[in-house]
């Protein structure tokens, strides 16, 4: 045996030596791919089998030729010396495993079926015997089963528990199962990678398991696969179907050959490519890891995994057969192809290109290609287009926002269009703001069009867009809403259904607040009544910065203020809009208008140098020295509540850390109020030099601040001032311990400052700056802040109005109120309206029908019925329009006095003449049908036609004079019988209007470009921005688009919105909104000291310079002198001019149109025809002499043309002598009787 073995080895060795070069052949024929002839093949088979079973000599078989060796042989690897193929052994291991197991399963099922049938028959016989033998107990229960049955039940239970345990182990519902599934998939991919590495070696080769690292890793992987296969087998309910699964087949043809490789010390590449089929489970794995969440992504990964796994598997089969050859051809027709060349071949085959550079030579390969083309072509034609479609339809903006450290971001959603986004960005990123270190993230469910995408790219450093919906929590997480500084929701101002748009925005608020209750939300609302729904959201808190910008409320509020002071809507709109300064050299009206347009509203904390000074003093100092206009402050009351006080008067002293509201052209200019230091900047004349100084400002105690303020009031030095006695100081110490920042007790420290003030000129000396203009209080100011109780003021008409049985104001005391009236009682016919002889009233032309959306006329009427007007000062309001529409609005209007309705149409000149439109103080043109038209250029057709219709009307001058004289009404505070003794001066008496062009009109527009059709004498270009057009500058046109700037202004300073709403709504508060949300109407209330105190708040008015106490300044005087005089004498705060358009021209016949000049400089020259915008204090005594006259007539009109819109100022002497003489009262009574 030894010799034989040696001889065999020797011949083999000799063959190896002689054929050494043949083992490493050329690239055409691989050494292990040489084929044998038929006889040598059979000899090789018998020789290989005999050598593998024993070491006997091979004398009985023919030795193969040297060129017939197949497997490379080395001395280190114990392998078959003859180099014969053993592929059949590897394949046989897989086939035996598969078919053997299948046979066992089928045999088991057959035996189980037979056993079940037999036992079923036997069980029926046994059960029948038990019933016949009476085996049941007396109580009807069966006897206990025998011990054998208990053992069977226990055995079944044990098997079931093992099966359940195995199911839990492989289930993806548990953490262990998910980890195991992911691990199996990862190891399968690892085994596939090992296959890719081994594919560069021959198909079959000798390998030493102990030295081959890849074989060892592959062996470890397959041991794990075997264990996992066992778990799956145990957990499977149907073993047969489990055996035929794709994953099971993969294990059959990949796991057993590895063990054969270890036994035979040789490797066969074989069917290991089947591991690529595991890629089909890739989408499931990603779902387990919570990576794939959308249906499109799951579908895309499924298609890709199926396509790639099929492709790689087919390439592996072609690689096997082409490198091996056909068995019936003795493996002689093989060709050397790498695996990746086979991958390439399969791709060009599936795509039907077939370049021919690589093709199959073996019969098995070509046969496989025939069938693969049928399936592969179908798969390629269906899968590839679908994959491309899914990839193409993927959201371009579907990523997630990555927050930048140290940089805030806001989320903007809602109505995202090119117009809304461009308007928002233009104002938000304006250069006049300080460096805006805020990133804007837009979230919308529709991808942007090309224009909007280009806009985003232009602002790519500060703007990002993501496609999604705020109603989806996943999308909210993508934009990091929880870390956002605020969320802004834009509304579609031009939608056909405003209520539906508001409902959408409310749902957005609910979704955002539900995801993150602490996020600050600023949303636009179209309808005022829909704001009440926001109060139902538990996490909605306006005190924490949540704000709802109601466009209808503000739009109609602006228009209402224009009825009181024409042009105010333009001025206020320009103040909170960021406009760049446009310099014009020519001396035209546009030059002065644009200088005012560059002003905006800013806030800044006041310097400690202002602490203890009164508001008028600080206001004058800021205007004269700092070139700043301060109109309001944020005041902290004794109970630490913050309130915004507009021109509060000189009874209020500035506290430490007071926030001021300024009108300025740049945010840097407002810093002067914070940097101002009396010690360092008192002698500086150039405000630009006022910068932060280096001196340390000691914090004064409350006693020192009060003593300083006291000395300012009395005009003495602190050493000589005796106002602050020791007892007062002791009381102040107690007060300081209770309220460290409160300084209200300083209100009573001075009594003789009035005389001193009148004797001294206006300078910047602290002793001479302090002005005293009477006791005034803001609507939100606590009564504790008033110097005197308003009920104790001599001559106060509120004493007479304190009737506990009469309700004249609403429950908050902010608005005039009357008992609800039926609409029939206020309807006027055309003849009744003509006989009423209306004058000084407001005509509201409204277009609408029964199907039109409500515009909320209550928001127009409420500012005109504010309680800081006396009853006789209220302008009568006449609505001209469809009675069907007005009936729908009447529910919110029936509690307001002096309201009438003329059914008709604003296009009817007869209706307009019946309401004396030529004698009105203002004509308002509104339309509720604007959003029902698709063509934007036609949305304003009704308003434009009505405006042109009124302007083309002609009126008889004699008729107007007769009507004015027959009316017999006197303006507020003026007695016609004794004009010399009248306390009113400065009344602007204008001639009667003979043409409609001179009628004051304000027209609401939807489309900004339609403003070009209102004035025929202007030269505005159609592309001119709205604020640059003549109708807007003159205050005769208003568009809701100007309110877009409020979103940015509110974000940067939430107090701005409160200030604007206080100015334009007449005093609407969150408490009032909550009350209206409950009843949808104002509730009447009895007069109390608290509600009557709310009347004491300032209001916007226009001051005439043609006559009165300021007439001397009207002819060439300086605006700054007027500002200081009005402030110190009447506590009136001037902030703009309403000037004739051609005032700068020396033409005899000037145009009657006026334009707005905002915050002119100190040295600005005045002309006599100017009207001054001012914040006027409430006068308690102005309505005393008119109270009985005004309330005795329900429909009387108490102001002549322009008398109530152009206010006059009581003189100082007459303020001290309020009670009218008996002669004056008798003359008033005579006028009243004559009128009746």
From Swiss-Prot:
Query: Could you confirm whether the keyword Transmembrane helix appears in this record?
Result: yes
Q: Where is this region: Segment S7?
A: 556-576
Query: Region (Heme-binding motif) spans which residues?
Result: 677-681
Q: Which residues carry this modification: Phosphothreonine?
A: 763, 970
The catalytic activity, as recorded, is: K(+)(in) = K(+)(out)
Quote the record's activity regulation. Ethanol and carbon monoxide-bound heme increase channel activation. Heme inhibits channel activation.
Record annotation: effect of changing residue 284 to K: No effect in the coupling between calcium and channel opening
The entry's stated outcome for residue 275 to N is: Induces reduction in the coupling between calcium and channel opening
UniProt effect for mutating residue 272 to E: Induces reduction in the coupling between calcium and channel opening
The alphabetical list of record keywords is:
Calcium, Cell membrane, Disease variant, Epilepsy, Ion channel, Ion transport, Lipoprotein, Magnesium, Membrane, Metal-binding, Palmitate, Phosphoprotein, Potassium, Potassium channel, Potassium transport, Transmembrane, Transmembrane helix, Transport, Voltage-gated channel
Q: Name one GO molecular function term.
A: large conductance calcium-activated potassium channel activity
| Comp. bias intervals (Low complexity) | 39-60, 1186-1211
Intramembrane annotation covers 336-358
What is the annotated quaternary arrangement, including any partners?
Homotetramer; which constitutes the calcium-activated potassium channel. Interacts with RAB11B. Interacts with beta subunits KCNMB1, KCNMB2, KCNMB3 and KCNMB4. Interacts with gamma subunits LRRC26, LRRC38, LRRC52 and LRRC55. Beta and gamma subunits are accessory, and modulate its activity.
Protein name, UniProt field: Calcium-activated potassium channel subunit alpha-1
Say which species the protein is native to.
Homo sapiens
Species lineage: Eukaryota, Metazoa, Chordata, Craniata, Vertebrata
């Amino acid at each position: 045996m030894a010799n034989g073995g040696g001889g065999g080895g020797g011949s083999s060795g000799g063959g190896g030596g002689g054929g050494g070069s043949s083992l490493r052949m050329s690239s055409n024929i691989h050494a292990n791919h040489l084929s044998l002839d038929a006889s040598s093949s059979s000899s090789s088979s018998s020789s290989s089998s005999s050598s593998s079973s024993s070491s006997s000599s091979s004398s009985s078989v023919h030795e193969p030729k040297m060129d017939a060796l197949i497997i490379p042989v080395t001395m280190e690897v114990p392998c078959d010396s003859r180099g014969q193929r053993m592929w059949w052994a590897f394949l046989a291991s897989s086939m035996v495993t598969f078919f053997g197991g299948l046979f066992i399963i089928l045999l088991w099922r057959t035996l189980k079926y037979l056993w079940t049938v037999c036992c079923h028959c036997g069980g029926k016989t046994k059960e029948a015997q038990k019933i016949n033998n009476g085996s049941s107990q007396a109580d009807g229960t069966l006897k206990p089963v025998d011990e054998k049955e208990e053992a069977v039940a226990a055995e079944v239970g044990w098997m079931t528990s093992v099966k359940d345990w195995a199911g839990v182990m492989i289930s993806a519902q548990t953490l262990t199962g998910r980890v195991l599934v992911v691990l199996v998939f990862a190891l399968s991919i690892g085994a596939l990678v090992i296959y890719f590495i081994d594919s560069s070696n021959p198909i079959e080769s000798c390998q030493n398991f102990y030295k081959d690292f890849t074989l060892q890793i592959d062996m470890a992987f397959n041991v794990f696969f075997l264990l996992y296969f066992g778990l799956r087998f145990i957990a499977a309910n149907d073993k047969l179907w489990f055996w035929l699964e794709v994953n099971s087949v993969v294990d059959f043809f990949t796991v057993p050959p590895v063990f054969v490789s270890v036994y035979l010390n040789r490797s066969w590449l074989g069917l290991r490519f089947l591991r690529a089929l595991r890629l089909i489970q890739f989408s499931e794995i990603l779902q387990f890891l919570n990576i794939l969440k959308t249906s499109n992504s799951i579908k895309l990964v499924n298609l890709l995994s199926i396509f790639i796994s099929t492709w790689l598997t087919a390439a592996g089969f072609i690689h096997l057969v082409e490198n091996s050859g056909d068995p019936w051809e003795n493996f002689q027709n093989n060709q050397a192809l790498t695996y990746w060349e086979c991958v390439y071949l399969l791709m060009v085959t599936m795509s039907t290109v077939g370049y021919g550079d690589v093709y199959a030579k073996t019969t098995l390969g070509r046969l496989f290609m025939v069938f693969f083309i049928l399936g592969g072509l179908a798969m390629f034609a269906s899968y590839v287009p679908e994959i491309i479609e899914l990839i193409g339809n993927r959201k371009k903006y579907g990523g997630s926002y990555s927050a930048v450290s140290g940089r805030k971001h806001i989320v903007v959603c809602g109505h995202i269009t090119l117009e809304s986004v461009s308007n928002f960005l233009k104002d938000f990123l304006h250069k006049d703001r300080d460096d805006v270190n805020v990133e804007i993230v837009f979230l919308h469910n529709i991808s942007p069009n090309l224009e909007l995408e280009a806009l985003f790219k232009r602002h790519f450093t500060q703007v990002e867009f993501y496609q999604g919906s705020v109603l989806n929590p996943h999308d909210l997480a993508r934009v990091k809403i929880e870390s956002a500084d605020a969320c802004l929701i834009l509304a579609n101002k031009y939608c056909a259904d405003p209520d539906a748009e508001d409902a959408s925005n409310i749902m957005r608020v609910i979704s955002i607040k539900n995801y993150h209750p602490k996020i600050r939300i600023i949303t636009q609302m179209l309808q005022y009544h829909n704001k009440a729904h926001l109060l139902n959201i538990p996490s909605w808190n306006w005190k924490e910065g949540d704000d709802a910008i109601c466009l209808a409320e503000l739009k109609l509020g602006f228009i209402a203020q224009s009825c009181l002071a024409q042009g105010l809507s333009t001025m206020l709109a320009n103040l909170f809009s960021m406009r760049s300064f446009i310099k014009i050299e020519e001396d035209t009206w546009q030059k002065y208008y644009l200088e005012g347009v560059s002003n905006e509203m800013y806030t800044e904390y006041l310097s400690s140098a202002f602490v203890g000074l009164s508001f008028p003093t600080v206001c004058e100092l800021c205007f004269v020295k700092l070139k700043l206009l301060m109109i309001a402050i944020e005041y902290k009351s004794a109970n630490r509540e913050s309130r915004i006080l507009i021109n509060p008067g000189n009874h209020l002293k500035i506290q430490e850390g007071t926030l001021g509201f300024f009108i300025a052209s740049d945010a840097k200019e407002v810093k002067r109020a914070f940097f101002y230091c009396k010690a360092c900047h008192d002698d500086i004349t150039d405000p630009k030099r006022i910068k932060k100084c280096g001196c340390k400002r000691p914090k004064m105690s409350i006693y020192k601040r009060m003593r300083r303020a006291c000395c300012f009031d009395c005009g003495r030095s602190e050493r000589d001032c005796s106002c602050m006695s020791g007892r007062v100081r002791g009381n102040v110490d107690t007060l300081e311990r209770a309220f460290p920042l409160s300084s209200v007790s300083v209100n009573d420290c001075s009594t003789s400052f009035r005389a001193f003030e009148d004797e001294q000129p206006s300078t910047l000396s602290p002793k001479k700056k302090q002005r005293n203009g009477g006791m005034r209080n803001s609507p939100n100011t606590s009564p504790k802040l008033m110097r005197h109780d308003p009920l104790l003021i001599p001559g106060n008409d509120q004493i007479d109005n304190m009737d506990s049985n009469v309700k004249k104001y609403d429950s908050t005391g902010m608005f005039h109120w009357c008992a609800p009236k039926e609409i029939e009682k206020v309807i006027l016919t055309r003849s009744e309206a003509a006989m009423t002889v209306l004058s000084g009233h407001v005509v509201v032309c409204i277009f609408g029908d029964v199907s039109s959306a409500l515009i909320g006329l209550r928001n127009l009427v409420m500012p005109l019925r504010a309680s800081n007007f006396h009853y006789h000062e209220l302008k009568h309001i006449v609505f001209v329009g469809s009675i069907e529409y007005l009936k729908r609005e009447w529910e919110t209007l029936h509690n307001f006095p002096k309201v009438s309705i003329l059914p008709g149409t604003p296009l009817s000149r007869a209706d307009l003449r019946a309401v004396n439109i030529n004698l009105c103080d203002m004509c308002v043109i509104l339309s509720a049908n604007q959003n029902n038209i698709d063509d934007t250029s036609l949305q304003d057709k009704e308003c434009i036609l009505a405006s042109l219709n009124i302007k083309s009307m002609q009126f008889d001058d004699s008729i107007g004079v007769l009507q004015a004289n027959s009316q017999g009404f006197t303006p507020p505070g003026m007695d016609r019988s004794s004009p010399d003794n009248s306390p009113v001066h400065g009344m602007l008496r204008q001639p009667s209007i003979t043409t409609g062009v001179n009628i004051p009109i304000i027209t609401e527009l939807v489309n900004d470009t339609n403003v070009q059709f209102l004035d025929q004498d202007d030269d505005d270009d159609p592309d001119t921005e709205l604020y640059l057009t003549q109708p807007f500058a003159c205050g005769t046109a208003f568009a809701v688009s100007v309110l877009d700037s409020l979103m940015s202004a509110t974000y940067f300073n939430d107090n701005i919105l409160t200030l604007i709403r206080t100015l334009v709504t007449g005093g609407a508060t969150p408490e009032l909104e909550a009350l209206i949300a409950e009843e949808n109407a104002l509730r009447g209330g009895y007069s109390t000291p608290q509600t009557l105190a709310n009347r004491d708040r300032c209001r916007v008015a226009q001051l005439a310079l043609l006559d009165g106490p300021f007439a001397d300044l009207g002819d060439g005087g300086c605006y700054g002198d007027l500002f200081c005089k009005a402030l110190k004498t009447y506590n009136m705060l001037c902030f703009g001019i309403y000037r004739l358009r051609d005032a700068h021209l020396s033409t005899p016949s000037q145009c009657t149109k006026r334009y707005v000049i905002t915050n002119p400089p100190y040295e600005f020259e005045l002309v006599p025809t100017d009207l001054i915008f001012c914040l006027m204090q409430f006068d308690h005594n102005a309505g005393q002499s008119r109270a009985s006259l005004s309330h005795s007539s329900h429909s009387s009109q108490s102001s002549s043309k322009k008398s109530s819109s152009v206010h006059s100022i009581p003189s100082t002497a007459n303020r001290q002598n309020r009670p009218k003489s008996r002669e004056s009262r008798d003359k008033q009574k005579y006028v009243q009787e004559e009128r009746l």
